[in-house]
Amino acid sequence: MLVLTRRVGEKIVIGEDIVITVLKIEGNSVKIGIEAPKHVKILREELYEELKSENIKASEVSKDDLKGVLRNDKGYKGPSASS
């Protein structure tokens, strides 16, 4: 981990197109501004972890859940005779 010290108004440049500016320091809180291209997703860590957890839950589908979805599909013929 790279650790840097910055004062209010000072910036950190990441790559060629991301700039982080220290806007305000109050007690234990630091307000920063981030300039980045629109395709770069920027999230607070707690939101990122929550999103990651929700994505993992959504990807864990049981066989019974899949069978239920298939049963509701009008084209579903049931398990094949070879299974």
From Swiss-Prot:
Q: Alphabetically list the UniProt keywords.
A: Bacterial flagellum biogenesis, Cytoplasm, Repressor, RNA-binding, Translation regulation
Give coiled-coil spans as residue ranges. Answer: none
Q: Which GO terms describe its molecular function?
A: mRNA 5'-UTR binding
Under the heading Pfam families, the entry gives: CsrA
Source organism superkingdom: Bacteria
| Predominant subcellular localization, coarse grouping | cytoplasm
Entry keyword annotation includes Ligase:
no
Which InterPro entries does its entry note?
CsrA, CsrA_sf
Write out the annotated subcellular location. Cytoplasm
Family matches, as PANTHER family: CARBON STORAGE REGULATOR (PTHR34984:SF1)
Share what the entry says about its subunit structure, partners included.
Homodimer; the beta-strands of each monomer intercalate to form a hydrophobic core, while the alpha-helices form wings that extend away from the core.
Q: What does this protein do?
A: A translational regulator that binds mRNA to regulate translation initiation and/or mRNA stability. Usually binds in the 5'-UTR at or near the Shine-Dalgarno sequence preventing ribosome-binding, thus repressing translation. Its main target seems to be the major flagellin gene, while its function is anatagonized by FliW.
Q: Which family does it belong to?
A: Belongs to the CsrA/RsmA family.
**The name this protein goes by in its record:** Translational regulator CsrA
Species of origin reads: Thermotoga maritima (strain ATCC 43589 / DSM 3109 / JCM 10099 / NBRC 100826 / MSB8)
Query: What taxonomic classification does the UniProt entry list for its organism?
Result: Bacteria, Thermotogati, Thermotogota, Thermotogae, Thermotogales
